[in-house]
């Protein structure tokens, strides 16, 4: 499949990352948004990417991968047994650290798409409309318990479609005439209105709209948007 990526770290290093891998006949791809940005965000993102690769080597089911990822990152950050500390004081470093992520698997032979999200949706552009497939209402690691299940959604795409996987940094950017957030609705409308353009044109439109909105204001968060054409 064709793809385009808008990747704008707020600092030199980023808490957002993207991922792609083959799993047999299927292609896996993801966008993740780790706690924080800069060095702390990059630290969690480095661990997240490593653990995601390991989980994806054992399964191609997005929900199963996210459940395994939750357990392995909690172990890597020494968060096991910290659930009871939610309202107390924890001496464990990185107890709150975690990530939001949207993960997809695509089988081109059967045109079957599976996806699972941790606090992130998948947006599907087809036939002039944008559909939102909600993720599970839980993060990876942080205060999420080991036994958390992440739901896999399955669709068969009969017609061409574009998938949009995004962190929250674009929609959360302050700017415009009144210094307000860009907001998800405005981003969705921009994606919908540019869905018939080439991937490169759509990427340029996203970049231009972001820069125009931000103006002279500081970038508030890492930005990562992956568009995949199926």
Each language-model region and where it sits:
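C-terminal catalytic subdomain
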Residues: 66-67, 102, 153-165, 170-230
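… and, occasionally, acidic/histidine-rich disordered N-termini of signaling adaptors
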Residues: 1-164, 217-230
């Amino acid at each position: 499949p064709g793809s385009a990526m808008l990747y704008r770290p707020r600092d030199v290093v980023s808490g957002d990352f993207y991922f792609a891998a083959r799993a047999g006949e299927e292609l896996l791809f993801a966008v993740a948004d780790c706690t924080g940005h800069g060095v702390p965000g990059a630290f969690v993102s480095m661990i997240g990417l490593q653990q995601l690769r390991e989980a994806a080597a054992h399964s191609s089911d997005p929900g199963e991968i996210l459940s395994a990822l939750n357990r392995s990152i909690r172990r890597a950050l020494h968060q096991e047994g910290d659930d009871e500390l939610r309202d107390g004081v924890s001496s464990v470093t990185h107890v709150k650290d975690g990530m939001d992520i949207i993960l997809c698997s695509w089988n081109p032979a059967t045109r079957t798409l599976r996806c699972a999200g941790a606090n992130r949706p998948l947006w599907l552009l087809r036939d002039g409309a944008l559909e939102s497939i909600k993720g599970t209402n839980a993060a990876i690691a942080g205060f999420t318990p080991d036994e958390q299940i992440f739901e896999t959604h399955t669709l068969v795409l009969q017609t061409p479609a574009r998938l949009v996987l995004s962190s929250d940094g674009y929609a959360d950017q302050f700017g415009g005439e009144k210094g307000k957030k860009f907001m998800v609705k405005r981003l969705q409308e921009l994606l919908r209105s540019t869905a018939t353009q080439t991937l490169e044109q759509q990427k340029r439109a996203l970049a231009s709209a972001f820069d125009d909105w931000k103006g002279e204001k500081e970038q508030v968060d890492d930005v990562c948007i992956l568009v995949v054409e199926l």
